[in-house]
Amino acid sequence: MVNMKASMFLTFAGLVLLFVVCYASESEEKEFPKEMLSSIFAVDKDFKQEERDCAGYMRECKEKLCCSGYVCSSRWKWCVLPAPWRR
């Protein structure tokens, strides 16, 4: 009886240890792509988004006019693609 309890305990402890080791290695693998992508797409601190005189697709068109190829939706006040029912 004692040997069976000890073997079950050791088996359970081994499974827990295996789980912890696998989880640790998996979390390290998940961090690697994040670090790689952040270094590839690193943005310069001085980089600023260029201001446009017109609003692009799905942007508000209350104060700005829509860029060429888009029309201002009268219902939603967004710049959308022109369609026959929007003319």
Curated annotation (Swiss-Prot):
S-S pairs: C54-C67, C61-C72, C66-C79
Pfam families recorded: Toxin_12
Propeptide: 25-52
Tissue-specificity statement: Expressed by the venom gland.
Lipoprotein recorded as keyword: no
Cleavable signal peptide: 1-24
Localisation: Secreted
Keyword annotations from UniProtKB, A to Z: Disulfide bond, Ion channel impairing toxin, Knottin, Secreted, Signal, Toxin
Molecular-function GO term, any one: toxin activity
One GO cellular component term: extracellular region
Keyword Secreted listed: yes
Superkingdom to which the source organism belongs: Eukaryota
Domain text: The presence of a 'disulfide through disulfide knot' structurally defines this protein as a knottin.
Homology family: Belongs to the neurotoxin 10 (Hwtx-1) family. 51 (Hntx-8) subfamily. Hntx-8 sub-subfamily.
Function statement: Ion channel inhibitor.
Protein name: U3-theraphotoxin-Hhn1a 12
Gene source species: Cyriopagopus hainanus (Chinese bird spider)
